[in-house]
């Protein structure tokens, strides 16, 4: 199955010049934890609720801070004609739950999530989720 057959096509976008307050409000109304950041038709980053909390609020940025100042610039993406099982393996390897989908002109056409893939390939998405939720570093909240 191709990613274009199971991706979410109605994707909300923010601009690098939008405020993190606006991004957080959009996440809340869309019930999502991630928004692609675009400059016109070009995908230039991603911003997550974690980015807002860790790179924004925890670093003293106020609600008027710009998305472009705290977004992740290194965007991992897949093509709309990629096979779903290959994308799922890639998502597990790079430990992401959501990935922007672009066409071969690198224009954003959708977003794929583990939930989207779970509807199509539940057994494989469970394995990917286990890989994604493995800690990538030392974490200790037992103190």
Show the residue positions of the predicted features.
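A contiguous binding-surface segment within folded domains or other stable secondary-structure elements
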Residues: 41-42, 46-86
């Amino acid at each position: 199955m191709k990613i274009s057959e199971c991706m979410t096509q109605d994707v909300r976008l923010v601009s690098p010049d939008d405020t993190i307050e606006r991004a957080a409000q959009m996440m809340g109304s869309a019930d999502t934890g991630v928004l692609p950041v675009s400059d016109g038709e070009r995908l230039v980053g991603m911003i997550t609720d974690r980015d807002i909390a860790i790179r924004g609020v925890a670093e003293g940025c106020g609600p008027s801070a710009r998305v472009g100042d705290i977004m992740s610039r290194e965007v991992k993406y897949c093509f709309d004609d990629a096979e779903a099982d290959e994308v799922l393996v890639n998502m597990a390897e790079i430990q992401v739950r959501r990935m922007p989908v672009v066409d071969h002109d690198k224009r954003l056409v959708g977003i794929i999530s583990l939930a989207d893939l779970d509807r199509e390939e539940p057994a494989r998405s469970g394995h990917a989720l286990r890989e994604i939720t493995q800690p990538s570093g030392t974490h200790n909240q037992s103190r």
